């Protein structure tokens, strides 16, 4: 089993280090990750400059680009053999509901999927307890299951794991994405030099968080696994828009 491992927190992040360590016990693992934190980079590709690839002292490769760049570069230009699977994470923080649109973690897995590879994004719904071994163990379980019973269709999974010890988990649930309220307003302040600057506001609170959603699973200390797709079409609105255009 050959695994390409990436993330959006950077090659130095504890999540990817924890995951690489346990995956190396069951697979050949190549780590290609951003040289710095690229959280929120979504599916962006770097097109305005060339990318460079370097190898760290710990054997991880890092790229001066986005999570999507990392996977694209590795699969299409770096690796001599294609990986059997792409895994992105472990992200330090949730990627539930609307988060998936912005997430570099999900984006790295999405790029693997677009390149024809089974892909998994995994996030620790962090409360600063640092239970990365819990999330890593969940990923190992999924990889072993994949090895024993490979998917017969292309698959892209978004996994969120409660920030608790493994023995406190209340199970695993296949879920749909919930929704958040709109994001908080930007935070505006002045620097000591009088310049007005802004920080992006916090994500909105959970809105659609009922039973069956990723939010609900995490609230009940269950691992959430959500199958994702690329097609963003609102099929139920095609007829409505056609009628609107003919008015």
Curated annotation (Swiss-Prot):
GO terms for molecular function: 3'-nucleotidase activity; 5'-nucleotidase activity; exopolyphosphatase activity; metal ion binding; nucleotide binding. A divalent metal cation binds at residues 8-9, 39, 91. Its main location: cytoplasm. Its EC number is 3.1.3.5. Keywords: Cytoplasm, Hydrolase, Metal-binding, Nucleotide-binding. It is found in: Cytoplasm. It is an enzyme of class 3 (hydrolase). Nucleotidase that shows phosphatase activity on nucleoside 5'-monophosphates. This is 5'-nucleotidase SurE. It comes from Nitrosomonas europaea (strain ATCC 19718 / CIP 103999 / KCTC 2705 / NBRC 14298).
């Amino acid at each position: 089993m050959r695994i390409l491992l990436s993330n959006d927190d950077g090659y130095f992040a504890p999540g990817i280090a924890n995951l690489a360590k346990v995956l190396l016990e069951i697979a050949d693992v190549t780590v290609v990750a951003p040289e710095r934190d690229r959280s929120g980079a979504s599916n962006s590709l770097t097109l305005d400059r060339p990318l460079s690839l370097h190898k760290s002292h710990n054997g991880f490769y890092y790229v001066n680009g986005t999570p999507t760049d990392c996977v694209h570069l590795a699969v299409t230009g770096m690796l001599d053999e294609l990986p059997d699977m792409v895994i992105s994470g472990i992200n330090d923080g949730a990627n539930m509901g609307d988060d998936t649109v912005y997430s570099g973690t999900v984006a790295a897995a999405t790029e693997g999927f677009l390149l024809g590879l089974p892909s998994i994004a995994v996030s620790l719904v962090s409360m600063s307890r640092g239970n990365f071994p819990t999330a890593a163990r969940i990923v190992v379980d999924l990889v072993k299951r994949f090895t024993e019973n490979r998917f017969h269709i292309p698959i892209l999974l978004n996994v969120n794991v409660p920030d608790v010890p493994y023995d406190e988990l209340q199970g695993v649930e296949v879920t749909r994405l919930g929704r958040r309220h709109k994001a908080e307003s930007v935070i505006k302040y002045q620097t000591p030099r009088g310049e007005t600057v802004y920080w992006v506001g916090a994500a909105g609170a959970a809105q659609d968080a009922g039973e069956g959603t990723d939010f609900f699973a995490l609230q009940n200390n269950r691992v959430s696994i959500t199958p994702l797709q690329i097609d963003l079409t609102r099929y139920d609105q095609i007829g409505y828009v056609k009628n609107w255009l003919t008015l």
